[in-house]
Swiss-Prot record:
This is Putative pre-16S rRNA nuclease. It comes from Bradyrhizobium sp. (strain ORS 278). It comes from the Bacteria. It is found in: Cytoplasm. Belongs to the YqgF nuclease family.
Amino acid sequence: MPAPILPLIEAAGRWPERGALVGLDLGTKTIGVAVSDPDRRLATGVETIQRKAFKADAARLLAICAERKVVGFVLGLPINMDGSEGPRAQSTRAFARNLAGLTDLPIGLWDERLSTAAVERELIGMDVSRAKRAEVIDTHAAIFILQGALDRLTTLRRSGQ
């Protein structure tokens, strides 16, 4: 049975109480990957996958999930500033559907609006060279996406929602 693909809050209801989550920043050429600790407090960068074919990309992602005992995915969904979904969001949803056919780990979609821009500003502020930024931006965007989702889930849990 394919994994459910849901908005983050609904996906959280399908994940076990404890266990690591993997955060993904999908690009056309790369996939930034971050993983949380089992208590879901901190996102840490794992790697940037150079995209090849879907099956190879998915095999690497699922290997990371097995290595890190991941219980669910947080996939950054690139929503337009007006709230609509453009071609990049459609491509992300297609990737999620394909991935869902290979795993039973619930997939949570999280609005990643401006995540790469925010990370790039931060790296520029840290005086990271353009070449080095290109190497690390996707992993850092995955960290940004996953940490934002973790923080939102923590806020909801604390408020009793």
